[in-house]
Amino acid sequence: LIEETRYKMVLTAHQADDNLETFLINLSRGTGIDGLTGIPPKTNTIARPLLPFSREEILTFATENKIEWREDASNTETKYLRNKIRHDIVPHLKELHPTFLENFKRTVAYLNDSSVLVQKHIELTKEKLFRKEGETIKISVAELEQLTPLNIYLYPLFSRYGFTEWQDVEGLLTT
């Protein structure tokens, strides 16, 4: 869309309920901390200004201000995982805890802060272990093996080099 329109940024209508659904999808699939940080409010080309607001708040605002609301017809079909979560799971969570969405937003903010902290630590660890010599990157395996728990470090340290499973990297250390 950016290339077609030559716009510098696209604004989406993602809101807090969408973020909760994304979190639950990622949680159900098994994910690391980055998968639990939810939908990013902004990237280089996408901004999500409605992310802090609930679907209910946005609908109320639209109604009060006579703004026409358009709902995607596929949103009602529970054959899609997101919609199943939206219609079957989230209402029960909100019923159990009426402040569930607000609590979730606080939790995601905490997880985002934690993710930043982890990334900074990983970068410092990488600077300590990785040495670039020309086109080659040398790694101190002895120092790498001292990291505990080792498996937590492997994916973030090596994923940008084409490794997608920490077990693959761990296997290299034992060969």
Protein language model annotation of sequence segments:
Residues E4-A13, D18-T107, L111, Q119, ...:
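Catalytic subdomain that performs nucleotidyl-dependent activation
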Residues L1:
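Conserved acidic catalytic loop of the alpha/beta-hydrolase fold
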Residues K42-T43, K105-T175:
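AMP-forming adenylation/ATP pyrophosphatase catalytic core
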